[in-house]
Swiss-Prot record:
Residues bearing PTM Phosphothreonine: 252
GO cellular component: cytoplasm; Golgi stack
Keywords: ATP-binding, Cytoplasm, ER-Golgi transport, Nucleotide-binding, Phosphoprotein, Protein transport, Repeat, Transport
Lineage, opening ranks: Eukaryota, Fungi, Dikarya, Ascomycota, Taphrinomycotina
SMART domains referenced in this protein's UniProt entry, alphabetically: AAA, CDC48_2, CDC48_N
Coiled coil (UniProt feature): none
Gene it is expressed from: sec18
Binding residues annotated for ATP, in chain numbering: 311-318, 592-599
Protein name: Vesicular-fusion protein sec18
Annotated localization: Cytoplasm
Length: 792
């Protein structure tokens, strides 16, 4: 057998007695695959034994103390040479140990140290069953790729403030215990620089050389797993909580207080549609905590202390904060709703803030940089951290809370073991000092999910339906993802609940009393259920269809060539906003006489864009509001539009919104300036906005220089002549007959003495509807139109 496959045997003093030995008794086949030169141990395959001489000890064995401290430090079970000749034994078919035969040791006994007895839950004089163990056999232990151990001083009365070199400790540990078997949870005491160090195996990762090469080893804390320590095993030490032991900052090994949970996987987070946001948060806030402290010290940087998550309601801000707490190997996060901080007693609100940081301060004083991470999560942060000086009242409680939070996060006594996560829907209300680097420096907008994100969310929320066979095959998740534009994650969850309610309702007997039908096993959620749910659940940041459709009740009548040209020009602006790389904002003014159809045309262009966000701003929605409330309302609509990738805002009758009247004249300059600013304000990167505004007072807007705020202007004229009037009244039932229309138009021309009309289309349609109620429709229509046509 090639001697390179022999592993060192432990001497009585716990050191290699000879460089190589046969791993098992018996003979080996000369045809077995052996190692080749220039191959690492993990690339080689050991030769396989042809037969094994395994002796089964008879009768139970009794647990006794190890013979000496030196023997206890070998991590071996002391046995009699008359009982065992093998190096490994398995006790009660669960714990594997290396053995050390000691002449004169009583037969039928196992000498176990205190760590052995603690790990195996043994009592002195306890009877156990023992068998030989073959780590190289088909059911043996694989080789350890890596192992993490938690260390502390065994004797709390004999410690030192001198930091230990973790790499030096790992080399000594590897050489002292090479070829021994280790499992998660196993306890061991070893000597390092004359100090007894107590270690507990936390996780291991194994590589089985017999079945594959270069396999990706995964860390596991499963106590049933075990592996064989080799000279190539990577060993990492982490100090125990509240331990006085100190480890030097390493340039190659991670921090001693690991930031991530063992075995953490990103795919287990269960966050749909937020992959890029979560990756950015991890890169900015946690990546530096994974690197060795020595490397971080060399860079001279501090870890990120605060993250601000902002965005519309229901988009997953709280979910990300909750999942971050699960991901990190830290204490249970302190979750605080903003208003809970406030208290009616003087000074108590500030005291509540100090209490949140008390544990972190205490541990940082005791352990310094070795302190564990403390996470504090503030929900509805804008409730307690408004801009200082903006709150009403003379108590100043809000300002004092902000001051206290600023001091705790980045004051004179800085803490480097905290992570504050704030969540809000109103980032604009947060005090600027809290948003600077050193405090809540990572600002992450959790916006509405795109189509790919919505598909992920739909799959997550319907996974249980699909796995249980309740989801019909006709449900296409990709179709639903395309139909749920601007739906937040919470609204998608509501959509699925609504679809389920339709499925439930099909199995309810409606009579004198509601009862469930017997065929419950046939409950299925199908495509029609989701389509019905889409008519019930509307996104908060979606299309104001009812408002806009009410402006185009009868549709658009192409009574003249200019109407088609206006629609075509409007479509060009829509395509410009959607596709142009240079213009993310386009504002268009539709001007014309009263009742000329400006609002209907603007609404038609907006609805035809099929943008996910379409809103109407009109004076109707602001009735009863004072000036400040109107400004806030208009600003809120524009802020909401910035949350959608593609948006259209229809601003109807600007002169009514700004309270303009010709007598005086009078108007609200605050509203005027607000609109002029918002019409020119560029949306954030990745967001596009089309503004369609209407006015019947273009001359007034020109005098106010407001027309300069628009990129383009479209004139919407009145109905000019009887030819255009004929095309309009064709759509009215009472004038469907061509002879009736010809008679009507001739009588109108005779009445007015001209073929000119110059009346708005909306006014004409209103006159026609009124005339339909009269017995003599034609006469009523002609008389009303004659009064409406302006006389020259």
């Amino acid at each position: 057998m090639d001697s390179r496959w022999k592993l060192p045997f432990m001497s009585n003093k716990g050191t290699p007695e000879q460089p190589m030995r046969k791993p098992l008794s018996g003979s080996y086949s000369h045809n077995s695959a052996g190692p080749t030169p220039n191959m690492s141990p993990f690339e080689q395959k050991p030769p396989l034994p042809t037969h094994m001489d395994v002796r089964r000890p008879s009768g139970p064995f009794r647990i006794v103390k190890a013979t000496s401290t030196e023997d206890a430090l070998t991590n071996c079970i002391i046995v009699s040479p008359m009982d065992f000749k093998q190096q490994y034994i398995i006790v009660d078919n669960s714990r594997v140990f290396s053995t050390k035969p000691v002449p004169g040791f009583p037969q039928g006994c196992l000498g176990a140290s205190q760590p052995h007895r603690e790990w195996a839950s043994w009592s002195l004089n306890q009877q156990v069953h023992v068998a030989d163990y073959d780590p190289y056999g088909p059911h043996g232990a694989p080789y350890l790729h890596s192992m993490t151990l938690e260390v502390d001083f065994q004797n709390r009365n004999r410690t030192t403030n001198e930091p230990f070199d973790g790499e030096e400790m790992a080399k000594l540990f590897c050489s002292s215990y090479q070829s021994q078997v280790f499992s998660p949870g196993q306890k061991i005491v070893f000597d390092f620089r004359s100090y007894n160090i107590k270690a507990t195996v936390r996780t291991i990762s194994c590589v089985d050389l017999l079945i594959g090469e270069n396999q990706d080893a995964e860390n596991t804390a499963d106590t049933s797993k075990r592996g064989l320590l080799t000279s190539q095993t990577e060993i990492q030490f982490f100090k125990a909580a509240h331990s006085a032991l100190r480890l030097k900052a390493s340039m190659t090994r991670p921090a001693s207080n690991a930031i991530l949970q063992p075995g953490f996987k990103f795919e287990d987070m269960g966050i749909g549609g937020l992959d890029s946001e979560f990756s950015a948060i991890f890169r900015r806030a946690f990546a530096s905590r994974l690197f060795p402290p020595g490397m971080v010290e060399k860079l001279g940087i501090n870890h990120v202390k605060g993250i601000l998550l902002y965005g519309p309601p229901g988009t997953g801000k709280t979910l990300i904060a909750r999942q971050i707490g699960k991901m990190l190997n830290a204490r249970e996060p302190k979750i605080v709703n903003g208003p809970e901080i406030l208290n009616k007693y003087v000074g108590q609100s500030e005291e509540n803030v100090r209490k949140l940081f008390a544990d972190a301060e205490r541990e940082y004083r005791d352990r310094g940089e070795e302190s564990g991470l403390h996470i504090i999560i503030f929900d509805e942060l804008d409730a307690i951290c408004k801009k200082r000086g903006s709150s009403g009242g003379d108590t100043g409680v809000g300002d004092q809370v902000v001051n206290q939070l600023l001091a705790k996060m980045d004051g004179v006594d800085q803490l480097n073991n905290i992570l504050v996560i704030g969540m809000t829907n109103r980032k604009d209300m947060i005090d600027e000092a809290l948003l600077r680097p050193g405090r809540l420096e990572v600002h992450m907008e959790i916006s509405l999910p795109d189509e790919h994100g919505r598909l992920q969310i739909l799959k997550i929320h319907t996974s249980r339906m699909a796995s249980n066979g309740i989801l019909e095959n006709d449900v296409d998740m990709e179709e639903l993802a395309s139909l749920t534009k601007n739906f937040s994650g919470a609204e998608i969850a509501g959509l699925i609940k609504s679809a389920s309610s339709f499925a439930f309702y099909r199995h309810i007997k409606v009579g004198t009393t509601a009862a469930v039908s017997g065929n419950l096993e046939n409950i299925k959620v199908n495509r029609n259920d989701f389509l019905n749910a889409l008519s019930e659940v509307r996104p908060a940041y979606g299309v104001s269809e009812e408002e806009l459709e009410s402006r185009v009740q009868g549709g658009i009548i192409n009574f003249g060539k200019h109407i088609e040209e206006i629609i075509t020009e409007g479509k060009l602006f829509v395509q410009q906003v959607k596709n142009s790389e240079r213009t993310r904002l386009v504002s268009v003014l539709l001007s014309g006489p009263i009742a000329s159809g400006k609002t209907a045309l603007a609404a038609t262009i907006a609805l035809g864009s099929e943008f996910p966000f379409v809103k109407l701003v009109s004076a109707e929605s602001m009735v009863g509001m004072n000036e400040n409330a109107r400004v806030a309302h208009v600003n809120r609509v524009f802020e909401d539009s910035y949350k959608s990738p593609l948006s259209v805002i229809v601003v109807d009758e600007i002169e009514r919104i700004i309270d303009w009247v010709p007598i005086g004249p009078r108007f609200s300059n605050t509203l005027l300036q607000t609109l002029m600013v918002l019409f020119k304000k560029q949306p954030p990167k990745g967001h596009r906005l089309l503004i369609l505004a209407t006015t019947s007072e273009r001359t007034m807007l020109s005098r106010m220089d407001m027309t300069q705020s628009f990129d383009a202007e479209i004139a919407v004229p009145n109905v000019s002549n009887v030819t255009e009037l004929d095309r309009i009244i064709q759509s009215i039932d009472s004038f469907a007959d061509s002879n009736v229309r010809a008679d009507t138009l001739q009588r109108l021309q005779n009445f007015t003495g001209t073929d000119a009309v110059n009346v708005g289309v909306a006014k004409i349609l209103m006159i026609a509807e009124t005339a339909k109620q009269d017995v003599d429709v034609v006469s009523c229509f002609v008389e009303a139109m004659a009064r409406a046509i302006p006389m020259e």
